[in-house]
Amino acid sequence: MPALAFPPSPLRSSAIAVSPLDLPAVSFFGRSLAEYARCFTLDPVALRGRDVLDVAAGPSSFTAEATARRIAAVAVDPLYGATLDELTRRVQEDYSRMFAQIRAKPRLFRFKTFPNFAAAESDRRAAAQRFLADYETHFLHNRYVSGALPHLPFLDGTFDLVLCAHLLFVYAARFDFDWHLAACRELVRVSAGEVRIHPLCGADGKPYAGLARLRRELRAAGIASQVLAVDYEFFVGSDSTLVLRRENS
């Protein structure tokens, strides 16, 4: 897959000292294609006919929306395989908990993507409902696959583009450096082109402390990396994306 054109980088914001979100476990929380387009700097039109994987996709509507735009999208998540009722309950529980935290810690958020918390919640809940409707129809057609990092159930180079949002770095307190390294290598393994990971900060909005070391070790393994500033920031510090590709690819 040819590298996608990068627009000029916007100004970066500075992290602020605030109490982090309480994330004792990975939340089942998702976003829309429009939000993915901004946080990953994607042009959906350019992706038509491409094979795209959304890793740790949760209840994001990206795959449903992308498929409607003739993008060959697949989503993978450890909770896929659960019944529709089970996932619906999980969405209700995790969304209620997450938005209660979001409203309680307004200094952790920026209103660049949404004008206010109500708009953000409405958009995210609409994305989840679209996911649930698509999951009910297409789970058995392998659009939604059960799997988890750092071991994905796909052959080498299956996808032109691999995306992973709000898992790596955000849950650094839960997953150690070795897990992050293994996860990055696995994402690259299943990609024939690029990997894009967003964001590069933790639940406190601070940059991932091990990023420089991670990039060095990936380079030693033949994986090139680039930090891409993006025109997106909902969570403070979430204004950059990591792009990975095999060197000379």
Feature map (PLM): residue ranges:
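Residues lining the SAM
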Residues: 165-169
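Conserved SAM-binding strand-loop segment of SAM-dependent methyltransferases
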Residues: 140-151
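Class I S-adenosyl-L-methionine
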Residues: 203-249
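Class I SAM-dependent methyltransferase Rossmann-like catalytic core
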Residues: 2-49, 61, 68-69, 81-92, ...
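Class I SAM-dependent methyltransferase "Motif I" SAM/SAH-binding loop
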Residues: 53-60, 66
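Class I S-adenosyl-L-methionine-dependent methyltransferase module
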Residues: 68, 72-142
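A short glycine-rich, Lys/Arg-flanked "PGG" loop and its adjoining helix->strand segment in the class I
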Residues: 177-193
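A short acidic, Gly/Pro-enriched loop at the edge of an enzyme's catalytic core
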Residues: 150-163
